[in-house]
Amino acid sequence: MMNIRVGFGYDVHKLVAGRELWLGGIKLNYELGLLGHSDADVLIHAICDALLGAANMRDIGYHFPDTSAETLNVDSKILLRKTIGLIATKGYQVGNIDATVCACLLYTSDAA
């Protein structure tokens, strides 16, 4: 019998000037980037959170805190590799990942 576990991950970072935009480990050519302690890759962060949750291993902030010098500007693919290693210590492996990215830029107008 298969032991299937499902996790749900969610992450949000603000778009700002002066940062690179990383999504799913790919650098996108865009004038804004996501603000964060690491590279702020929201897709990878949400995936890490989902994997950790499915394994009942808390969340990404617990394992990779934004107060750690080790995670400052880190490539989120490294966090994903470490997360996969963490869940492997509990006997779990990734069978499938399904992710949806919701993104928008809010524009405001002086007209009311």
Each model region followed by its residue ranges:
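Active-site His/Glu-centered metal-binding helix of metallohydrolases
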Residues: 43, 47, 51
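Acidic-glycine-rich active-site phosphate/pyrophosphate-binding loop
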Residues: 13-27
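A short glycine/serine-rich beta->alpha loop
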Residues: 28-38, 66-71, 106
